Amino acid sequence: MPKYRSATTTHGRNMAGARALWRATGMTDADFGKPIIAVVNSFTQFVPGHVHLRDLGKLVAEQIEAAGGVAKEFNTIAVDDGIAMGHGGMLYSLPSRELIADSVEYMVNAHCADAMVCISNCDKITPGMLMASLRLNIPVIFVSGGPMEAGKTKLSDQIIKLDLVDAMIQGADPKVSDSQSAQVERSACPTCGSCSGMFTANSMNCLTEALGLSQPGNGSLLATHADRKQLFLNAGKRIVELTKRYYEQDDESALPRNIASKAAFENAMTLDIAMGGSTNTVLHLLAAAQEAEIDFTMSDIDKLSRKVPQLCKVAPSTQKYHMEDVHRAGGVIGILGELDRAGLLNRDVKNVLGLTLPQTLEQYDIVVTQDDAVKNMFRAGPAGIRTTQAFSQDCRWDTLDDDRSNGCIRSLEHAYSKDGGLAVLYGNFAENGCIVKTAGVDDSILKFTGPAKVYESQDDAVEAILGGKVVAGDVVVIRYEGPKGGPGMQEMLYPTSFLKSMGLGKACALITDGRFSGGTSGLSIGHVSPEAASGGSIGLIEDGDLIAIDIPNRGIQLQVSDAELAARREAQEARGDKAWTPKKRERQVSFALRAYASLATSADKGAVRDKSKLGG
């Protein structure tokens, strides 16, 4: 029988000092036999996805206390990728994932907490907390802040839905008037919550459902809707049950590594491919799997991508649907239901509610459930009122979207595409693979060949695109922007958005060892591995080289002979200390970022730290 971790600090005369300090936080004699549960919050006023979380930790804590536990809240940092985008701030985004994971480990282990409720939401916060949860392997439940309502505005006498990416594209389009650009900017992000499309934050919060670590509805129920409050109340109650099951009944099925098993990781990636999730999820699932000591690699993702169809299409891949529409169609469980009926899921998995996948689908899939309360929850919709307050409205759709032929979520027979929304490509400068969000690629450019235009920083590429130096047919190559080379593996949302604003969204390709925002669409290929800074062949590409992209056959090829590439590699190595570095780039890199770069691995490893360099 495992002993409560917290007993280390609450039992025995030699812990009198620790108990004295616990008393100063409000604990009493009656609390010293109870489980201590960390409420891991991520409230900040910097990020719309987190601005409403201030009081939600208290909400969870009250339920923990009522259920017989002791709740202790602490906060992590949270970087807003959209605000950090397009300048030096983006260098810090991916490294913040490791800091978040480490900070959770530090707090939980330093104070011997028994379990956690993780209140996350945006791009690196959910992955960081997920990595920490699987590293620590103590009972955990995730409950995120929820998606933002889609923006709406009237253009050309038509009401259209908007999000952050629309504001960026309009702002950079010289053909758009100042007044229209300002109108879109003011309408794009109307409420608190994670940006309204299937971007990285919402993708990851959906994946926690498929991993079994959060409750049904977590990924899609709007931040502003009153129904979302119940997820927080349930999390507080349920975590005490899970904790007691493990520590008092020796039930290891309550632990995250036994819930988020390899089978669950395969289900999560299957969901990701089917819903056309952000390419960043590949990085984060690979990183989380390593923390869980699960053998889940790019090879597994490649195999899944070849057999899983695209059953859901959401912004940025279409303007028609946003997360509020996914929820109305049954949310994550709705997609999982269709995947299960297609025979594409591992069924022998459980979630934090203790339900198997078939039990979860029976109760929560709107196509089959007889539970009116569940159907009512999935009718939760937007209010269209600007707010930063959680649970501030209770509007409902008149009907559910259960049309699996033409609705937001489709059945296998009516899939948007027989190929899934993500694909792994391999070739002579991506020997370890690269990732493309096929959900956002127009059919006309699934096969594309063009001359390379090579840039050694995102800034240079942006300048060239806006300066008209990139033309239809070009393949833009941005290198030395990987985890080590950036450092920090910047997102390339500005270059892809500016290609669209210049009318080149369906006429050019962009390839990088960096990564893309979940808001990216178009022929955007990232995570090229190995990265240039690690000696990857992307560092050997020269202006004018022809690059052939073949998504249907999962290929990407630099049309240069092996002999020529060998000669270029020899010349690169001859640069000595300057080898595999940009020839010219002005960039201030802090000590903190250099420390991150010194341990960073390429994207095919999840951009995690190289433990071998530390002897572990």
Curated annotation (Swiss-Prot):
The protein's required cofactors: [2Fe-2S] cluster; Mg(2+)
Keywords in alphabetical order: 2Fe-2S, Amino-acid biosynthesis, Branched-chain amino acid biosynthesis, Iron, Iron-sulfur, Lyase, Magnesium, Metal-binding
Pfam families: ILV_EDD_C, ILVD_EDD_N
Reactions it catalyzes: (2R)-2,3-dihydroxy-3-methylbutanoate = 3-methyl-2-oxobutanoate + H2O; (2R,3R)-2,3-dihydroxy-3-methylpentanoate = (S)-3-methyl-2-oxopentanoate + H2O
Location of N6-carboxylysine modifications: K124
Biological process annotations from GO: isoleucine biosynthetic process; L-valine biosynthetic process
EC number of this enzyme: 4.2.1.9
Name the record gives this protein: Dihydroxy-acid dehydratase
